[in-house]
Amino acid sequence: MWLLLTAASVISTLGTTHGLFGKLHPTNPEVTMNISQMITYWGYPAEEYEVVTEDGYILGIDRIPYGRKNSENIGRRPVAFLQHGLLASATNWISNLPNNSLAFILADAGYDVWLGNSRGNTWARRNLYYSPDSVEFWAFSFDEMAKYDLPATIDFILKKTGQDKLHYVGHSQGTTIGFIAFSTNPKLAKRIKTFYALAPVATVKYTETLLNKLMLVPSFLFKLIFGNKIFYPHHFFDQFLATEVCSRETVDLLCSNALFIICGFDTMNLNMSRLDVYLSHNPAGTSVQNVLHWSQAVKSGKFQAFDWGSPVQNMMHYHQSMPPYYNLTDMHVPIAVWNGGNDLLADPHDVDLLLSKLPNLIYHRKIPPYNHLDFIWAMDAPQAVYNEIVSMMGTDNK
């Protein structure tokens, strides 16, 4: 971030006076759009809804009821629900061109597509009882996303569509909350046709990303630095970086490398002309507590609930002195997995451990050059991943 700030200062000083660092391409209009605007911009229908969870969080969700290629057929369609990863939002699924974005591809393939948002991100930052300015609002991690957000959202979607089941597609933390929800909530698990897991994350024992250094900071020091509320929210300056800094010659490589350092390198597979769209909507924010939960996972190498810091606190939340482990062998939902050999967050060794514990693994493919973000943004994602998903969903619908 400081490197990008320095670049912004240099560009402001030199670029305006000497004509240096010219823009590589015009700013994409989706930079300033919300989710439904991004959808309709490409000629797709969009619907916005709000889901209220059992504990009062208000989640914005979006729907693409049909595609551009099949608008004449308005009958009931099979449902596909897409859930984003850490520090992200539903925009991840629609940030590329229509022929490169999974949400649009599924809509054109005849699916009723729904895009979820996890509590605390840009589109899910309200609660019936707590203000986002309060500490209480931010007292959550991916535990609560699995316990409250997923059940409420899936229940809403199925009631709205009149369907009994849906296809679930998760990326990164979107798979994490799926693993938890579908292994601890058998009733919910029965409502999932198939779980499509992209860059799945359960344990993070072997992850080698630079974020590990941040995760190793003691909790008290982490809170001293970042507070105890929101972590890395979307800010107007992100949009400035995306449109006025990262869209310029040479600096665009600096910006893309900032992503690669965290998620793994696959330099030839990122559409640089869409970089301003990616960066203007990400990061979308989460809670400090959620990041601390991931920090605990890095340190322990275990897949378990949030440790509240003392046996007494844990007893209050779990009726036991230690946070419970999540048992992946209890998840019997059919699951198809895609992971990347160059993924620094969902490390292949961690994925191998995960695969060995899944009792109903129906498909697995490892893509050697793929990093963590390739599954949502890679230029060849349709050929490498999405076409397989569409084909498998079609078979599952018969």
UniProtKB/Swiss-Prot annotation:
UniProt-listed Enzyme Commission number(s): 3.1.1.3
pH dependence as annotated: Optimum pH is 6 for short chain and medium-chain triacylglycerol and 4 for long-chain triacylglycerol. Inactivated when pH is below 1.5.
Highest taxon listed in the record's lineage: Eukaryota
GO CC, any one term: extracellular region
GO biological process, alphabetically ordered: lipid catabolic process
Main enzyme class: hydrolase
Range of residues in the leader sequence: 1-19
Cystine connections: 246-255
AB hydrolase-1 domain span: 82-377
InterPro entries for the chain: AB_hydrolase_1, AB_hydrolase_fold, Lipase_euk
Main location: secreted
Keywords: Disulfide bond, Glycoprotein, Hydrolase, Lipid degradation, Lipid metabolism, Secreted, Signal
Pfam families membership: Abhydrolase_1
Annotated control of activity: Inactivated by thiol reagents 5,5'- dithiobis(2-nitrobenzoic acid) and 4,4'-dithiopyridine.
Catalysis performed (reactions): a triacylglycerol + H2O = a diacylglycerol + a fatty acid + H(+); 1,2,3-tri-(9Z-octadecenoyl)-glycerol + H2O = 1,2-di-(9Z-octadecenoyl)-sn-glycerol + (9Z)-octadecenoate + H(+); 1,2,3-trioctanoylglycerol + H2O = 1,2-dioctanoyl-sn-glycerol + octanoate + H(+)
Family: Belongs to the AB hydrolase superfamily. Lipase family.
Protein name, UniProt field: Gastric triacylglycerol lipase
Lineage of origin: Eukaryota, Metazoa, Chordata, Craniata, Vertebrata
